[in-house]
From Swiss-Prot:
It comes from Mus musculus. This is Na(+)/citrate cotransporter. PANTHER family: NA(+)_CITRATE COTRANSPORTER (PTHR10283:SF109), SOLUTE CARRIER FAMILY 13 MEMBER (PTHR10283). It is a multi-pass membrane protein. Belongs to the SLC13A/DASS transporter (TC 2.A.47) family. NADC subfamily. High-affinity sodium/citrate cotransporter that mediates citrate entry into cells, which is a critical participant of biochemical pathways. May function in various metabolic processes in which citrate has a critical role such as energy production (Krebs cycle), fatty acid synthesis, cholesterol synthesis, glycolysis, and gluconeogenesis. Transports citrate into the cell in a Na(+)-dependent manner, recognizing the trivalent form of citrate (physiological pH) rather than the divalent form. It is found in: Cell membrane. InterPro entries: Na/sul_symport_CS, SLC13A/DASS.
Amino acid sequence: MDSAKTCVTKFKSFAILLFTPILMLPLVILIPDKFARCAYVIVIMAVYWCTDVIPVAVTSLLPVLLFPLLKVLDSKQVCIQYMKDTNMLFLGSLIVAVAVERWKLHKRVALRMLLFVGTKPSRLMLGFMFVTAFLSMWISNTAATAMMIPIVEAMLQQMIAANTAVEASLGTLELLDKNKTSELPGSQVVFEDPNVQEQEDEETKNMYKAMHLCVCYSASIGGTATLTGTGPNVVLLGQMQELFPDSKDVLNYASWFGFAFPNMVMMLVLAWLWLQCLYMRHNLKKTCICCGEKKRDTEKIAYKVLNEEYQKLGSLSYPECNVLFCFTLLVILWFSRDPGFMPGWLSFAWVEGNTVHITDATVAIFVAILLFIIPSQKPKFNFSSQTEEERKTPFYPPALLDWKVAQEKVPWDIVLLLGGGFAMAKGCETSGLSKWMAAQMEPLRLVKPAVITLILSCLVAMTTECTSNVATTTLFLPIFASMARSIGIHPLYVMIPCTMSASLAFMLPVATPPNAIVFAYGHLRVVDMMKTGLIMNFVGILSVFLSVNTWGRAMFNLDNFPDWANSTSVNT
């Protein structure tokens, strides 16, 4: 039976791999345009990504083959997409995360946080979500996720180990109590129900899925709260200044924060509830605050186990201090580079006109390089006090990180995954697929503004699953601005929801770097992300719609068509 099932699975994978390109050929044959050829490649990649018939990283390389072959892009245009600024930001962040993991700083932080928060999974998840979202407000979503995931991984391992020990202890005590009248002297029999064990394993897997998804989701959600928190927000600000120069300061750091921060909190709470219901519903009663005495005793034992593990780490070591310094330096430099509400250190010497010479990627690579330089041991400058053995060792101790460790620990396949997403976005732009999609929106002129907003938000949320969110907003916002002006509605009534919908990339690993980072840890399948992310997309779209139509109307005066929009010529 198992062999037959394996054969069917293999045949299914082979059939999808072979017949998907063949079945989609009419798209290229019947529509002899470049945008149709681009759509052909995107559909194939989407199917392969969703079904995992070949490795995700290999699917990401398809544009390098198919775009030049189908004359969508030449080879040089495609290949350059695989090592862009965002890829370097991602790589630098992961190298820092590897250093944190190597010296077990994440374990120390994880145990300390776990001791403070407790072992209730629901409380842990909510804490992770708000911390990650807060970080994403000020630093890049990619960096926040790359820094939080090792901590999440360590906390989960410690929590599962502690709870397993507690359950085994309580189970043994309960068994002894039930059998104390019939137990033979010096003997003890323990019976394990395989169904119970299977259920516990499934609950553990679900907890891993929920905890990892909550981090990448909250990173994407948290970035929406500030103008500089994520790329689409910055694109919106730039498009407003370019398309509507008379709008002056209608959209600034303070006004955006006042609108977007409450929406972020609402989305985080809804996301937490959805993840709890989907993956941890069996634990809802166990994790309730008002639980019984038995649960409180369990938590006491778990706390004792965790505290013992924490004590084993000893005091903060020299390499841990250096890694902590590098991590703190990274966060401070990211935050202070260009905070938005005040001039950052970037403006002192590295901005010339519209050219910005230093990005977050520069900072990430700088700190990553430091990790290969800063020593992991204290250098001894007093040669007279050194022993004979110490004199034989090199003067400068080994660095915090060496290339062998970095090469083994960094998930290089995810770099290709991100590059594939950028190549797809470039193909859409160059082939005219984005213009074709805009032409399909002409009938929306006859629809009510609220319905237009919902439809366009869904369109953007769908598009951003396959292309970068920055590219999506860059392509769509000028079109939406022109449409809003032509039908006489406030441009921000359409542009704000669509900008925020570009951050609702919850369904695919390639959709956004936080998803890719989480996916790299191996606890999730593409199907898991699609199942969870589909509802998250609807939750996000409806939350943004509610925000725009309540306090957003009052803040931006969305009920009235502004003079600055009427007097501006918008060119798409």
